[in-house]
């Protein structure tokens, strides 16, 4: 599915009413539900009305309400389509001959080609003009417009199927063009692909004009799908006018249409209104033949009766097929198709209507598109058996050639021929991809089916390649593998190489001889690719890479899982990454070993170069060994815990404690006036110590603070303070070497701290007492009790803050407000510069701590 182009989702429902010259009975509403090949959620139902009064006069009037495409674009499309048709017809003939088709098959192909050419020319020239805002060119195309073309179609079922498939393709083209969502280039791709697929028939020409005429506004998929479905249905009807057995499947197809494909298929009352100008609206009169056949021919009301199954099989098949198929065709098949030009195989498939395997086909397919089974069945009187999936596959056979041309390989999925056999096995899984792939091909399938009852099962990518070599036999033999093959198809994108596998060999078992087979046989060869490659491509709707298109397949890299996690692209390797412990961890362990904490560890250090699991185990062991015997105490909060829970320097139980300790050290750095910092230190150091030990110390320090002159002996107070300051400063210096980022001040001034601690030791007791007394003389010991004047004095005493003190007084900041201040308050509200603000805030923090 990598290669699928996104297709706008629109309702799959298409209402097709076919008015045969004699009867309206076989009008069917084809609605495809989400079940079919991924086309199931389309909101809008494009409507197409095709009026083909009589076989002789088959006219399609398309009135488009709004043509979003520019006329020039439409004209270009038409020109491209015509050129492609001519090339394809020529290529088809050559390819069929190259494929060594049986003489009968070749003859039938020739007849089909002739009929298609006649139909195209007649349709384009005499055919009723298609009214479209698009270039005038588009208006002239009608496949079956002339009686001669109608006669040709009626005359040969294969011819009819070809013409019908052409119509279906036209519908596809219309759908693509009309889809507003599709870009012009995409539309071109669709057109090319369709033309290639259906080029054998004049219908291609008709399709082109339709494209132009089709209203671009319509969502591409729904309209296209509907058109395709209708056309496909029509085509099968015309082609399979003989065989009614398969009718049940195809509600709208009602393939049973009498051989006369000429019967008009006004059908699409639903959205088809010509006035609507829906893409479908552009149905070529030539197409009408197929619809006519559908509806009447046999009068099998398959179309009508089938509506119940919903999604007249053909239509539904087309829908699912078209939506996915278009995407594929766009990227893979459509563009390449013009080069490949393997449409010829189409005819081959058409030529062999003989093998009637109608019944099987219907059953299996219903799930897929519920419709497609019938489609396939009807397409060839004998080959109806193809399920929807098979239809898609069959289409590939006929159209496959077309598809293949696109990349040749990409689509080479050889529709391994949609024989009934395959229907059964993979109606569901297999058919979806094909449907998706070959929306256009659905019509083709009809054509192909006559050629071989061969099951379309060959969806399996493996079969595709093989089928080509097998040539004739390959497509037919598909039935057996079909179930799993189809299942494979969805997976194909991943590994197309599979298609090359022997599955194809199986095909020969069935009707290898038949035309379908030959078409598919030469997947690899350009001409053959159309047949084989197509089927494969349709099968691999998701992965339009045939065995031959392996390159398009998903490129298989060695198993590397790639994850996108929070914007990071993470690729998993086949082998574990060489993981080593973090340098910090390794450094710590080395220190421990050196210190002899863990004597048994050193041997384990060798594990650092070992695998992840080996590396983890020793560390866990270390942690356990450390944990049981080794417990550490936090230097700040006093908490005792296992050593492995202590971070980095193993001195603090948590980062919070480490940071708080660092803050304390920073405050004690000699940042401030020596007098002031010493005064402050007298209080702060005792506070820090008190907090660390939480014991009898608090009461002692409180006493010292409360008594200015010191009821407690001054020597005791001084000794405590000196000891604390010395210990704190040594802690700070120790901290700076182990702890993570200390503040620049604290990290850079461990020496100054040490010096200051030394100085404090030398200070006489009286000097310390004087400092304490001075501090308490100026300010109350509790900052919360300060008034505005106290705060003013405090700020004025800070270095460089004399001028700012007035601002504090003006703002009426008292002690409590002071403790609530933050740096931003100082800078934003009071317009204080950063330097003084930081100093003031540092002092406020110290006050809080005290």
Swiss-Prot record:
Subunit-level organization: Component of a PRC1-like complex. Interacts with CBX4. Interacts with BMI1, PCGF2, PHC1 and RNF2. Interacts with CHTOP. Interacts with the N-terminal region of the SP1 transcription factor and with MAPKAPK2. Interacts with SAMD7. Interacts with SAMD11.
Name the UniProt record assigns to this protein: Polyhomeotic-like protein 2
Annotated Gene3D superfamilies: 3.30.60.160, Transcription Factor, Ets-1
Domain notes: HD1 motif interacts with SAM domain of PHC1.
Sequence segments annotated as region (Interaction with BMI1): 33-56
Modified residues (Phosphoserine): 613, 743
Annotated spans, Disordered: 1-79, 233-314, 335-386, 402-436, 528-553, 597-624, 676-712, 725-764
Comp. bias regions, Polar residues: 368-380, 402-425, 696-712
Positions of the SAM domain: 786-850
BP terms from Gene Ontology: spermatogenesis
Motif (HD1): 550-579
PANTHER family in the record: POLYCOMB GROUP PROTEIN, POLYHOMEOTIC-LIKE PROTEIN 2
Known tissue expression: Isoform 2 is ubiquitously expressed in embryos and adult tissues at much higher level than isoform 1.
Biased composition (Low complexity): 15-32, 343-352, 529-543
Binding site for Zn(2+): 634, 637, 653, 657
